[in-house]
Each structure stands twice: as C-alpha cells, then as structure tokens.
Amino acid sequence: MKGGNAWALCWREGNEDLMRKATAARNAQLASSQPAREENIAAIVTHLRAGAKAECRRVGIELEHICVDGTGDPITYSQPNGVRDVLAALQEKYPEATVHGGDLLGVARPGAAVTIEPAAQLELSAGPFENLIDAKRVFLEFEDDAYQALSPIGGRALTLGFDPVNRAADKELIPKARYDYMNEYLSSIGPWGPRMMRGSASTQISIDYADEADCIAKMRVAQVLAPLFALMCDNTPVFEGSRRPHALMRTEIWKYCDPDRCNSVPGIFDEGFGFEDYAAYLLDVPAIVALDDDGEARYDTRTFGEIFAHRAMTDDEVFHAMSMVFPDVRLKSYVEIRPADSMPIPYVLAYAALIKGLFYGKSSLETLVRSCAGISESDVAKAKDALMESGYAAEVYQRSAAEICDELITLARRGLPAAEWYFLDPLAELVARRVTLADLDISTQ
C-alpha cells in the first residue's frame, strides 16, 4: 500500500509539473495575443484587494420572488398592473429609480435595492447587515410592501426555487438587452440557461473578507459546502409544470447551463490560487454581453481578454465582467455564495445565520478549512450528483451527508453570538428531520 501511494504521489507530482508547464506556455501565448492582458489582470486584482475589510462580520442577502396572479399565471413586466407597475408602487418607499430606455427596472433606498431578474422575478438585495435582527426587519417590511403593491390584481410574490405552474419557455423576458443576448447565447448550449433565467429564483448570501488569503480560504470552503447548502435550502418541489424528477433541481440547472461560467471556478483548489488566477478566469470567459462606448449592452462571444486585448478595462468594464460569470461561489468585492433556492423569510434568515456562524466564527472556519483540505473540483461535482440522487441519504466526501449537515449546524451555532442562535432554528429543524422544504411540499400534495 505504501509503495502504491508513493507511485501515485510521483505520478500526481509529474502530472502537476506537466500542467504547470502547459499553463506557463498558454499564459505566454495569451500575453502575446493580448498585450493588455497583464494590465487588465492588475485592474481586476486592484478591485478585489480594495474589497478587503478587516474585522467585518457582515452579511448581504439577496432574495428573489416569483410573481404570479391569483390563478398562478405569471405576472409579466409589461402587462397592466404588471411588475413595472409593482416597481412604480414600491417607489414611494424606495425612491431611487433605475430607468433605462423609458423602462423602470429598479427602485432603491439606502441599504435596500429592488430589481428584476430576466422573467420579472422580483429581487430584494439588502445589507450588508452587522446583525440579523436588522435583516429580519428589512425583509419583513419588504414582504409587506410587495404584498400591498401586488394586491390590485390579487398577486403574490412566491419564495420558491422554481415557478410552480408555468414552463420557463412560456415566460416573457423583461425589456433589457443583456437578457436578450444571454437568452440567445445560453439557448445555443441547451434548455438549461433559459430555464435558469425564466423559471428559477434564489437566495444568495454575501460575506466580507479581510485579505486575499482569507478570501480564498472562504471561497474554497464555500465551494466544498455549496452542494450541502443546496440540499439544506432545497425548495423546488415542481419543475417545468410537473413534480420534480429528483432533488436539488437548481443544482442541475447550473450544472448544465454553461460550463464556461458555472459550477466551480477552475483551479480554485490549486495550491497558490489567488486573485490573479480569478482575474485570468474572468478574462477567459466568453463575454456574451459587452459594453459599447456609451455603456450600452451589445452581443459579443469573444472572451473578455480578447475584447480588451489592446487596452485597459475601465472600472465599469471590470464590474461588468465580474457579473457575467455564475459559479457556485462568485467573487466581487465580497464573496457571494449562490447555490440556495428562494425560501420563505424565516429560512432565509436561518441560512444567513448558518453562513455567518460558519465563516465569521474563527474556530468554526478553521475547522472547516482543515476538513476541506484535499477536496477537488471533481469531488464537488460527485457530491452534487450524489445529493441530487439521494438527498440526506447520500455519502459525500467519504462521509454521510446528513452527519456533515448536523456538524454544520453545530459549528454555525458556535460561531454566532448567543443572541442570534435562534435564527438557525428553522433550518436546524429541517436538518434534524432529514427533510427539505421541497420534501414537505411534495408530502402534502
């Protein structure tokens, strides 16, 4: 056994040496064909370093809602009393309007922005919050505001992972060129991109990082745990008008949506991975949408590196490139954790508490960093497949998924202030029962 392990180690080290040489050759080729590449990598890295925030324990929360009328039909953007009018009604309390081409596309106030996703899913992005009681207040207030704005047509803002009635292809896109171009490009890959755009709704949690090392450590842990977060937050009982074929439909949607920009960030687990590697990843992704000289969207399937081969990117162009990748864990000026379905507010707050306790509790994060050591992108992909097939009964990373989730609840509680422990309870109860919100919905049908 020892001899076999030694041989395997030599083989792996030999392969790593070959990979390093191949990477160096590719980088040299890219530098030759993209003279501004190093300057653009530096511009992206500068932005990422500027995002570092020492001693912060804040969470940002984004929650998407699927708007339907009293019959379950989608409420479109442009219909009478549609989502455009919902935004107009919300403007009384969220007075900062985003208007493009005469279309109202978002409203905001300090600390809270209401925007719309491709098929008019209503999203509240709020925070960052130092404490969860403030998050609870903001989200409950928005829930009441949305209810009032939708009441003229008996509408509802559903917190589910996928439209429970309508097929994605039948849903209207909002008037935004970015989404037209994304729909065209992703449709050429398969049906999953349009399903993501039109049918899905999510919960996303963002966390701060202190420096580059802290950022990469948090990204790696979040990537390893992403399949388990998806399980704990699974809230898609219905998919494309029928009972779902298996658990974690959001995971499957993103698995096949576009391999160039989804799933794990390539190389995230490689020794030495850092901001420069993430910047190179951004430059090597097909843009789909680029910005012209007036800041307007245009269709472009070249990579960002090719588009900006001969000049430095502006800040707006850097921000845009960051928004055009959709991995499980995305980096901007914060770490964005993306695998969870949209959920009712008590579960959103529980999920935020889970993330806060795991990633800001010093001993909890240190425990997770040790536990995640040696896990690869392939291991994460296998974990997703196992959880889609077997849920809590699955084995992932050579352990029981259910037992890992138990430990995550314990570690999160350890990392939270005692005054916020109770926020974890809704999610902890689901984990203890080995069920998801989707399971509970299916069991009542």
Describe the residue ranges of each PLM region.
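Loop-rich catalytic cores of soluble enzymes, especially ATP-dependent carboxylate-amine ligases
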Residues: 155-158, 162-330
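Glycine-/small-residue-rich active-site loops that bind phosphorylated ligands and cofactors
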Residues: 131, 210, 343
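Terminal catalytic/cofactor-binding subdomain
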Residues: 5-191, 199, 234, 347, ...
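Structured mid-domain segments that build the active-site/substrate or prosthetic-cofactor binding neighborhood
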Residues: 288-378
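Structured core elements
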Residues: 66, 204-206, 336-338
